[in-house]
C-alpha cells in the first residue's frame, strides 16, 4: 500500500471514530411516553390489523427526546441485561403490537434498540427500560384510557373538543400539557395518540414541547375529535 492509500485508510478510521463518539454523546432533555388508541391505529393502517383492536390506549413507546432536536436513536448499549421473560405477560397487555400481536417481541425489540438505548443513565439496561414502562403505565397511573375515563370521556365514538381532552389529561399529569396526535379519515378526525412528557429523570411531568402544527396531517382541531 502506498503513502496515499495509507493516508486514506487513516483518515477513514479517524472519521469512523469521530462518528462513533458523536453518536454515543447524543443527549436527551426529556422523555415522551406515547400511547396509541388501538381502534384509530387500525383504521389508519392500509392492511387490516390481524386481531380485533381494543378500545384502549396502549403503549407505543417511551422515547428519550431532545428539545432542540434531532431526537437520539440507536445508541450504544452500555449495560447488558436482557428483558426478563416474566415481564412479557404484562407487556403483552399494555404494549401489544396492535397490527399483529404474534410479533410483540419484534415490536418491543425495535423500541428498545431505537429508543431505550438512548435513555442512559435514567434507563440503565433493557430490562430496566421495560420495567420503567410497566411502572409508569400501572404503578404511576399514567394509563391514558383511565385518565380520560375519570373525566367521563369514554371511547364511545363521540366527537370531543380538544380542550376537554387536554384538560382531562392535565388533571392526571400535574396540570402539564400533553401532546395529541390526530388523523383525518374522510371527513372525520380521529384521536390517535396522546403523549405525556416528563423531565430527564422521568420523575416529573413537564409541558410537552413541539405540538403538531396546523399544516401537519396529525394536527388536532379545536372541535369534533372522534374518540
Swiss-Prot record:
Pfam family membership, one: Ribonuclease_T2
Keywords annotated in UniProt: Disulfide bond, Endonuclease, Glycoprotein, Hydrolase, Lyase, Nuclease, Signal
Keyword Lipoprotein on entry: no
Superkingdom of origin: Eukaryota
Reactions performed catalytically: a ribonucleotidyl-ribonucleotide-RNA + H2O = a 3'-end 3'-phospho-ribonucleotide-RNA + a 5'-end dephospho-ribonucleoside-RNA + H(+)
Keyword Nuclease found: yes
EC number(s) recorded for this UniProt protein: 4.6.1.19
Residues involved in RNA binding: 36, 60, 97-98, 107, 110-111, 114-115
A GO biological-process term: RNA catabolic process
Residues annotated as catalytic: 60 (proton donor), 111, 115 (proton acceptor)
Positions annotated with a glycan in the UniProt record: 45, 143
GO terms assigned for molecular function: ribonuclease T2 activity; RNA binding
Disulfide bridges in this chain: 42-49, 75-118, 182-220, 197-208
First and last residue of the signal peptide: 1-27
InterPro entries: Ribonuclease_T2_eukaryotic (IPR033697), RNase_T2-like (IPR001568), RNase_T2-like_sf (IPR036430), RNase_T2_His_AS_1 (IPR018188)
Post-translational modification: N-glycan at Asn-45 consists of disaccharide (GlcNAc-GlcNAc). N-linked core structure at Asn-143 contains xylose.
Gene Ontology cellular component annotations, sorted alphabetically: extracellular region
Protein purpose: Self-incompatibility (SI) is the inherited ability of a flowering plant to prevent self-fertilization by discriminating between self and non-self pollen during pollination. In many species, self-incompatibility is controlled by the single, multiallelic locus S.
Family of the protein in this entry: Belongs to the RNase T2 family.
PANTHER family per record: RIBONUCLEASE 3, RIBONUCLEASE T2
UniProt-recorded name of the protein: Ribonuclease S-5
Amino acid at each position: 500500500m502506498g503513502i496515499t492509500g495509507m493516508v486514506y485508510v487513516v483518515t477513514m478510521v479517524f472519521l469512523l471514530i469521530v462518528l462513533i463518539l458523536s453518536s454515543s454523546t447524543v443527549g436527551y432533555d426529556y422523555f415522551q411516553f406515547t400511547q396509541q388508541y388501538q381502534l384509530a391505529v387500525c383504521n389508519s393502517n392500509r392492511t387490516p390489523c390481524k386481531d380485533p383492536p381494543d378500545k384502549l390506549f396502549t403503549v407505543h413507546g417511551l422515547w428519550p427526546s431532545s428539545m432542540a432536536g434531532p431526537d437520539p436513536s440507536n445508541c450504544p448499549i452500555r449495560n447488558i441485561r436482557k428483558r426478563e421473560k416474566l415481564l412479557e405477560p404484562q407487556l403483552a397487555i399494555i404494549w401489544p403490537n396492535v397490527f399483529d400481536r404474534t410479533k410483540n417481541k419484534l415490536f418491543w425489540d425495535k423500541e428498545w434498540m431505537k429508543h431505550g438505548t438512548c435513555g442512559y443513565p435514567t434507563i440503565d439496561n433493557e430490562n430496566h427500560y421495560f420495567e420503567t414502562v410497566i411502572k409508569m403505565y400501572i404503578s404511576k397511573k399514567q394509563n391514558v384510557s383511565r385518565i380520560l375515563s375519570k373525566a367521563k370521556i369514554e371511547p364511545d365514538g363521540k366527537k370531543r373538543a380538544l380542550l376537554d381532552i387536554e384538560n382531562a389529561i392535565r388533571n392526571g399529569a400535574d396540570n402539564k400539557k400533553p401532546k395529541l396526535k390526530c388523523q383525518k379519515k374522510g371527513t372525520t378526525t380521529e384521536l390517535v395518540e396522546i403523549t405525556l412528557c416528563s423531565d430527564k429523570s422521568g420523575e416529573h411531568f413537564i409541558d410537552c414541547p413541539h405540538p403538531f402544527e396546523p399544516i401537519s396531517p396529525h394536527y388536532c382541531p379545536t372541535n369534533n375529535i372522534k374518540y
